[in-house]
From Swiss-Prot:
Protein name in the entry: Protein artemis
Effect of H33A: Abolishes PRKDC-dependent endonuclease activity and V(D)J recombination
Nuclease keyword on record: yes
InterPro entries: DRMBL, RibonucZ/Hydroxyglut_hydro
Organism annotation: Homo sapiens
Keywords of the record: Adaptive immunity, Disease variant, DNA damage, DNA recombination, DNA repair, Endonuclease, Exonuclease, Hydrolase, Immunity, Magnesium, Nuclease, Nucleus, Phosphoprotein, SCID
Underlying gene: DCLRE1C
Biological role stated in the UniProt entry: Nuclease involved in DNA non-homologous end joining (NHEJ); required for double-strand break repair and V(D)J recombination. Required for V(D)J recombination, the process by which exons encoding the antigen-binding domains of immunoglobulins and T-cell receptor proteins are assembled from individual V, (D), and J gene segments. V(D)J recombination is initiated by the lymphoid specific RAG endonuclease complex, which generates site specific DNA double strand breaks (DSBs). These DSBs present two types of DNA end structures: hairpin sealed coding ends and phosphorylated blunt signal ends.
Length: 692
């Protein structure tokens, strides 16, 4: 039973399937089909007076509905005010207010509803959006997708509201057998009964005057027997139905209706009062098409159920089932959905709760725009949920990893310096374990690993660590050993240099006491190697402005000529003025080779000796080893503590007493380089992290 009041919120000046109360002021009327619950007030005296006072009010319906309506004398006063619209034909209608002359243009399209002969749905399009009124309808799943006029440009039209037939919008009626299934069951029962004898008769107990024509026409066509009905006037202009119906009572299939049909049935008489010939009693069975009765069953039943000695129920419906309603609405996906019928045993609020999730209003009404992103790369994304259009596009592609290049000018971490001191200054090594641990973590965390051109020797000797450093450095070296994420240089490079016992007799090793896992930092050369240790050295050291940043940041290297390499001298200074000293004695045969040294190593061109002493920046755990063995002349590494040199300037390094001026033949290679136009320069480093 329809509960629709007749007016839509989008177009309140028209009335549909309701013709009383506020609807009397409508500018136009629409009738979906000829069932009494949709015709309230259609023949009321008040509406007749309205038509008499108006010249531009009309009733719009389908051609079949017009024929069915005008067959009744009660509705013949509408004859001059009914306009039929062909199905699936968009028609423009002008809604005129006769008092003010205001005019509104709308386009109306009639769509088949599948409810009964002539039943249609109304699709309204105008300034207030697109609205669909279904009336009573029965559409199977997927039929909405086959209606072209519900689509535009290959997609469903943007529908603002749907006024929906919700007669069976109840989970109890989740699935209703199709009309074809019901017809198959009824056809089998009727055939098995009427073929027994001419006195076996079937009565189709149908409540409504329209809607069961589908059964009548198909039974008559399959069995070759016409169906008896009370009147044929309504089908006079429908020959496809009229051919299968008759008013002759002498037939085996009846669909006649009588106000006291049940009484006639109790006395074994048909509503039409037909009796048998030759006083032979008739054998009559009744088949009542219904849907509500099946919805109240707690167990699944067949399409045809026997309810008495001669009575049957057939599950036949011309309203959409619960699943068909959801399929229809979810396909259209309107902004709003309003129920036209309150199902038996439920409330309007429950129906609205069912319809609301199927509408766009339950989601965001604003369209979601997403960039297409980078289409050159495909990416598989695993979803935890299956949520509509939020996962249509892939997430933005990740930024490619960048190489770890140090930027000392932008990042200045706090470094806990620890310098090696002489026996006269043991208090400088008395740092707390917390400071040492922080220094180790800082150095290992911010150390970047760059390519090194030098290969380490395959045979690495282990030397002892002084007892004065074991207590303070034990925790630091043990912590570094536990850090398995820091790679060792031995994994990437091999040692090719030979180590002499004389060169290591005065040098301690950090690998014996603590087993440090920190990377070994060193300067590289084509013919020699110089290894450095800061934590294990017993000297008092300091970093100059030019050499303070090299061992922390692992930055660029510069080429030194053979003259600079032979005259390199790095003197050890105190903590306030630290400068490493390099003393080399290289034969002239090797002076033609360039030495690749770290950028932060400061070479004194005025000093030259057989001993080489290199001390790196503080806070950088390294390994001390000997230089590569040279066949012509061995260069030994000896540790020399020179406390007097602590007063040297950052810009001028005085020559040591043992230094000699470079000989002329030593400078020959340098002059050749200058003659060819090749530039030889020692680049200066920027301010170190430790200088801050």
């Amino acid at each position: 039973m329809s509960s629709f009041e007749g007016q839509m919120a989008e177009y309140p000046t028209i009335s549909i399937d309701r013709f009383d109360r506020e609807n009397l002021r409508a500018r136009a009327y629409f009738l979906s089909h000829c069932h009494k619950d949709h015709m309230k007030g259609l023949r009321a005296p008040t509406l007749k007076r309205r038509l008499e006072c108006s010249l531009k009010v009309y009733l719009y319906c389908s051609p079949v509905t017009k024929e069915l309506l005008l067959t009744s004398p009660k509705y013949r006063f509408w004859k001059k005010r009914i306009i039929s619209i062909e199905i699936e034909t968009p028609t423009q209608i002008s809604l005129v207010d006769e008092a003010s002359g205001e005019k509104e243009e709308i386009v109306v399209t009639l769509l088949p509803a599948g409810h009964c002969p002539g039943s249609v749905m109304f699709l309204f399009q105008g300034n207030n959006g697109t609205v669909l009124y279904t009336g009573d309808f029965r559409l199977a799943q997927g039929e909405a997708a086959r209606m072209e006029l519900l689509h535009s440009g290959g997609r469903v039209k943007d529908i603002q509201s749907v006024y929906l037939d919700t007669t069976f919008c109840d989970p109890r009626f989740y699935q209703i057998p199709s009309r074809e299934e019901c017809l198959s069951g009824v056809l089998e029962l009727v055939r098995s009964w009427i073929t027994r004898s001419p006195y076996h008769v079937v009565w189709l107990n149908c409540k409504a005057a329209y809607g069961y024509e589908y059964l009548f026409t198909n039974l008559s066509e399959e069995l070759g027997v016409q169906v008896h009905v009370n009147k044929l006037d309504m089908f006079r202009n429908m020959p496809e139905i009229l051919h299968h119906l008759t008013t002759d009572r002498n037939t085996q299939i009846h669909a006649c209706r009588h106000p006291k049909a049940e009484e006639y049935f109790q006395w074994s008489k048909l509503p039409c009062g037909i009796t048998s010939r030759n006083r032979i009693p008739l054998h009559i069975i009744s088949i009542k098409p219904s849907t509500m009765w099946f919805g109240e069953r707690s167990r699944k039943t067949n399409v045809i159920v026997r309810t008495g000695e001669s009575s049957y129920r057939a599950c036949f419906s011309f309203h959409s089932s619960y699943s068909e309603i959801k399929d229809f609405l979810s396909y259209l996906c309107p902004v709003n959905a309003y129920p036209n019928v309150i199902p038996v045993g439920t409330t309007m609020d429950k129906v609205v709760e069912i319809l609301k999730p199927l509408c766009r209003s339950s989601q965001s009404t604003e369209p979601k725009y997403k960039p297409l992103g980078k289409l050159k790369r495909a990416r598989t994304v695993h979803r935890d949920s299956e949520e509509e259009d939020d996962y249509l596009f892939d997430d933005p592609l990740p930024i490619p990893l960048r190489h770890k290049v140090p930027y000392p000018e932008t990042f200045h971490p706090e470094v806990f310096s620890m310098t090696a001191v002489s026996e006269k200054q043991p208090e400088k090594l008395r740092q707390t374990p917390g400071c040492c641990r922080a220094e180790c973590m800082q150095s290992s965390r911010f150390t970047n690993f760059v390519d090194c051109e030098e290969s380490n020797s395959e045979s690495e000797e282990e030397v002892g660590i002084p007892a004065s450093l074991q207590g303070d450095l034990g925790s630091v070296l043990h912590l570094q050993k536990a850090d398995g994420d820091v790679p060792q240089w031995e994994v990437f490079f091999k040692r090719n240099d030979e180590i002499t016992d004389e060169s290591l007799e005065n040098f301690p090793s950090s690998t014996v006491a603590g087993g440090s896992q920190s990377p070994k930092l060193f300067s590289d050369s084509d013919g020699e190697s110089t290894h450095i240790s800061s934590q294990n050295s017993s000297q008092s050291t300091h970093i100059t402005e030019q050499g303070s940043q090299g061992w922390d940041s692992q930055s660029d290297t510069v080429l030194l000529s053979s003259q600079e390499r032979n005259s390199g001298d790095i003197t050890s200074l105190d903590k306030a003025d630290y400068r490493p000293t390099i003393k080399e004695n290289i034969p002239a045969s090797l002076m033609e080779q360039n030495v690749i040294c770290p950028k932060d190593t400061y070479s004194d061109l005025k000093s030259r000796d057989k001993d080489v002493t290199i001390v790196p920046s503080t806070g950088e755990p390294t390994t001390l080893s000997s230089e590569t063995h040279i066949p012509e002349e061995k260069s030994l590494l000896n540790l020399s503590t020179n406390a007097d040199s602590q007063s040297s300037s950052d810009f001028e390094v005085p020559s040591t007493p043992e230094a000699e001026l470079p000989k002329r033949e030593h400078l020959q290679y340098l002059y050749e380089k200058l003659a060819t136009g090749e530039s030889i320069a020692v680049k200066k480093r920027k301010c170190s992290l430790l200088d801050t």
